[in-house]
Amino acid sequence: MTKAEAYDKAWRLGRKGDFSLVDEIYHQNYKSIDYRTGIEANIEDDKVIVSTLGESVVFGPSKALFEGEDFVCVEGFAKRQLNVNDPSYGIMMTALSYQDGKIVSQKTVSSDLDFDPSEGKDWNWEDYE
């Protein structure tokens, strides 16, 4: 399994309450800063955030844009279903830095999309629910 695949699988399992792979691939010194708020988060904070998303967000397919020994960049799509009849869509890019083979920091940026990224593609949201 590549680093990008492990990252994707870890958080998909985490959304189901299984954080064993998250614990395996993250460094004990991991931290992330949300520059919008200035808040520093550790891996336990990230687990709480993922656990509270519930069914309101569906994460679609992701792919590695770059994968090296100490750095990985992953792109992924999300569908936010805050209103049953009015979903919104986004694209995210996550930069992962590694130390001793484990994720020591990450930064995610996202942008809203004004279209459904699954349209005309060989995947659908139901595959990821």
Question: Which residue ranges define each predicted feature?
Answer:
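C-terminal and inter-domain tail/linker signature
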Residues: 1-129
